[in-house]
From Swiss-Prot:
Residues covered by region (Membrane-binding): 1-164
Gene expressing this chain: M
Any one GO biological process: viral budding from plasma membrane
Name of the featured protein: Matrix protein 1
Cellular compartments annotated: Virion membrane; Host nucleus
Organism: Influenza A virus (strain A/China:Nanchang/11/1996 H1N1)
Annotated stretches, region: RNP-binding: 165-252
C-alpha cells in the first residue's frame, strides 16, 4: 500500500458515510494525483461543508495544506487553527511540544505514527496545530504519520460507540436503528437508480420503503416490525443490479 493510499484510508475512516464522504474521497484522490491545485478554493469548499465535526475539518484542511502546492505567504485558515488547538488545554500543548520534538528527529511515516499513537487525541491535534501554524517543521512523511495516528484514535472511539449501539439490547434503539438504515439504503437506491427505464422499479421500491418508515414513525409500531427491512431493500437493489448486468454481492 502506498503512503498516500494509507493516508486516504485513515482520513476517510473518520468521515461519516453519505454523499459528502464520496465528495471528500474524490477530492483527496484529485489532490494526491496532483489534479487539484487551487488550495484556496479547496479550503473554502471544506469550510462550508455541513455534518463534519470541526476536528475532522481541521484534519482534512491540514492534509490539503500539506499536499497542495501553495504560495509561501498564503494565509492560514482560522477554522483549521481553531480545530487544532487541543481545546485550549495547556496540558495538551505541553504534550504536543514534547511530541513535536520527537517527530522532528523522525523522518519515516511509520516511525512517526508509532511515536504518535502513545499520545492522546488532544495532544495529537495540538501538535498538528503547531506544524500547521508554521511554529515547527517536520518532514511531510512524519506529518502524515501524525495525521494517521490521530485518525486511528478517533476511529477507535467511533467504533466502540458504534459497537455499543449495535449490541444494545434496548429494543427501541434497535428498532430506530433498523429504520434509519432502511431509510438510508432507500436513498442510496434512488441515487444509484439514475434515470434509465429499468430504474423505475427500483425507485418505486425505495420510495415505498421510505413512506413505510415515515408511517411507522408517525403511528408508532412494535419494535420487531422493522426486522429485516434493510435486508429486503438490499435484495431488491441486488436484483435490480443483476438485471442491469452489475454484480455486487457485498452490501450486507
Amino acid at each position: 500500500m502506498s503512503l498516500l493510499t494509507e493516508v486516504e484510508t485513515y482520513v476517510l475512516s473518520i468521515v461519516p458515510s453519505g454523499p459528502l464522504k464520496a465528495q471528500i474521497a474524490q477530492r483527496l484522490e484529485d489532490v494526491f494525483a496532483g489534479k487539484n491545485t487551487d488550495l484556496e478554493a479547496l479550503m473554502e469548499w471544506l469550510k462550508t461543508r455541513p455534518i463534519l465535526s470541526p476536528l475532522t475539518k481541521g484534519i482534512l484542511g491540514f492534509v490539503f495544506t500539506l499536499t497542495v502546492p501553495s504560495e509561501r505567504g498564503l494565509q492560514r485558515r482560522r477554522f483549521v487553527q481553531n480545530a487544532l488547538n487541543g481545546n485550549g488545554d495547556p496540558n495538551n500543548m505541553d504534550r504536543a511540544v514534547k511530541l513535536y520534538r520527537k517527530l522532528k528527529r523522525e523522518i519515516t511515516f511509520h516511525g512517526a505514527k508509532e511515536i504518535a499513537l502513545s499520545y492522546s487525541a488532544g495532544a495529537l491535534a495540538s501538535c498538528m496545530g503547531l506544524i500547521y501554524n508554521r511554529m515547527g517543521a517536520v518532514t511531510t512523511e512524519s506529518a502524515f504519520g501524525l495525521i494517521c495516528a490521530t485518525c486511528e484514535q478517533i476511529a477507535d472511539s467511533q467504533h466502540k460507540s458504534h459497537r455499543q449501539m449495535v449490541t444494545t439490547t434496548n429494543p427501541l434503539i434497535r428498532h430506530e436503528n433498523r429504520m434509519v438504515l432502511a431509510s438510508t439504503t432507500a436513498k442510496a437506491m434512488e441515487q444509484m437508480a439514475g434515470s434509465s427505464e429499468q430504474a423505475a422499479e427500483a425507485m418505486e421500491v425505495a420510495s415505498q420503503a421510505r413512506q413505510m418508515v415515515q408511517a411507522m414513525r408517525a403511528i408508532g409500531t412494535h419494535p420487531s416490525s422493522s426486522t429485516g427491512l434493510k435486508n429486503d431493500l438490499l435484495e431488491n437493489l441486488q436484483a435490480y443490479q443483476k438485471r442491469m448486468g452489475v454484480q455486487m454481492q457485498r452490501f450486507k
